[in-house]
Every structure is written in C-alpha cells, then in structure tokens.
C-alpha cells in the first residue's frame, strides 16, 4: 500500500504537501476497477482507498433533472453497455439512474453527492472530469455547492476546460495550465502558475517542460492509461514513460489500476 490510510486528505493547494506525496496517485475512471467494482462506482472508490491512492478521478454527467451523477460509459452507446438499459443517461432522472445496477455487479450508478461524501470519509482527493454538454449555470452551481458541502475546496482539481466551468468553480478547484502559459514558460518567460497544474499524456510532456512548470509554480499530473498505447505494448511503453517522468521530477500520475504495480500497489 502506498498511502497510510490515516494520512490526511491531500491538499492540492500546498506545494509542500504535493512534494511530500510524490508520486501523487490518482485512480482513473473512478477508482480501482475489479470484478464487483465497475468504473465510477462507490465500490471502485472504496478500493482506491484500500490500495492507497491519494485521489480518484470522477466522471460527472448531468441527469435529466439536473443532478450531477457519475458515469463514463461507451461512446454513443448510452446506458446499454454498462447497465443493459436502452436509454441515454440524460433521458433519466437521478432517482431512476441510482436504481440501475451495473451489469454483472451489485453496484449502482452513484450521484456526485454520494461519491464526494465517500471520498471525504476515506480521505481521498478528487479529480473532476465534468463531461461536456449544455453545462448550465444551475448544474455547475450544484457541483460547486456539493464541493463546499463536503469540504473539498483544498483537495479537488478538474481536468475540464470548458469556458463556463472556471467562473462557476473558481474557488473550489484547481484548473490546468493553459497551452499558452505552458508555451510561455517553456520559452523562458516568467509566468505565475501557482495554484495550477499540468495535465496530459506522457508523450506530451518533455523533461524540459517539467522543469519549466516547476520553476513557475505549477505541478504536473500525467495520465498513464492503457488506451494511450498500442495493444501489444501497453505495459512496456507505460513503464518507460513512468521511469522517465519520475526521474524528471513529475509530481503525480493518473493511472488505470492495472498500472498499480508500477508504483508498489498490488
């Protein structure tokens, strides 16, 4: 296990805390995926805590009645692949959705409220992936209210970059460094990047960029996901990337749980 379960929840606004946790580990797709722990389920979140992750990535979508719920799903297939229901998520209310069970599992679709309450109780930080859509002011306001209710303001980042999200969640989450500011930092310009983080694929982050970001106050979280690599080499190429980026000083990794052993998680 990497993280002591009694350790305090990560403070993403504290540079010393980030460095002390290195490598900071974020469980992709809502936690550790296992036989009875589908992605974005409460069971997967619990397993992330058991296995010592610092944070979980939560995929957030809007139900028909405006309630934020957790779901990733297969592109264009709605709820059929995961829950065996011939509907799209946005066609059902939150009450209808949480009544649905994932196929071959006892786990149900969860609301963001349920997930944040569980993360708070387990000492897990949160990476929000707010899936694009209409993103109404009311919907984003509900997300902000839930983050406040569960005291997530110092332990949450988002990888969503839609223009509507920043003003709605500005006091509750950290946002990614913009491509423009990244370029300026890499060109040697002094750019204030404190309170921001870099997020992206390993192939997008040269070692020199890691150093440039750190000089200007930002930290990095690199995604290591199986779909980033060819099917015949998803293990070997990922391990190469992890070794390189660890040596370069990268602070965090968002990983599929199959890569846990690369960080001493079994």
Regions found by a protein language model. Give the residues of each.
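Phosphate-group recognition and catalysis centered on beta-loop-alpha active-site segments
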Residues: 1-266
């Amino acid at each position: 296990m990497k993280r002591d379960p009694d350790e305090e929840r990560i403070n993403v606004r504290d540079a010393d805390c980030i460095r002390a946790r290195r490598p900071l580990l974020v469980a992709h797709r809502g936690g550790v995926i296992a036989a009875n722990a589908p992605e974005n389920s409460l069971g997967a979140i619990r397993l992330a805590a058991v296995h010592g992750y610092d944070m979980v990535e939560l995929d957030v979508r809007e139900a028909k009645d405006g309630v934020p719920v957790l779901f990733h799903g297969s592109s264009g297939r709605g709820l059929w692949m995961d829950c065996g229901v011939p509907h799209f998520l946005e066609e059902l209310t939150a009450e209808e959705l949480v009544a649905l069970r994932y196929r071959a599992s006892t786990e149900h679709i969860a609301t963001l409220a349920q997930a944040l309450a569980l993360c708070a109780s387990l000492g897990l930080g949160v990476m929000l992936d707010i899936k694009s859509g209409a993103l109404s002011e009311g919907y984003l306001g509900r997300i902000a209210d839930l983050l406040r209710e569960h005291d997530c303001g110092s332990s949450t980042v988002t990888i969503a970059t839609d223009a509507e999200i920043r003003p709605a969640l500005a006091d509750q989450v950290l946002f990614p460094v913009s491509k423009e500011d990244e370029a300026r930092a890499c060109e040697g310009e002094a750019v204030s990047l404190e309170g921001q983080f870099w997020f992206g694929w390993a192939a997008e982050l040269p070692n020199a960029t890691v150093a440039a970001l750190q000089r200007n106050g930002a930290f990095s979280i690199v995604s290591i996901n199986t779909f980033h690599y060819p099917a015949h080499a998803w293990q070997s190429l990922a391990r190469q990337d992890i070794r390189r980026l660890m040596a370069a000083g990268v602070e965090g990794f968002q990983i599929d749980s199959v890569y846990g052993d690369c960080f001493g998680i079994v």
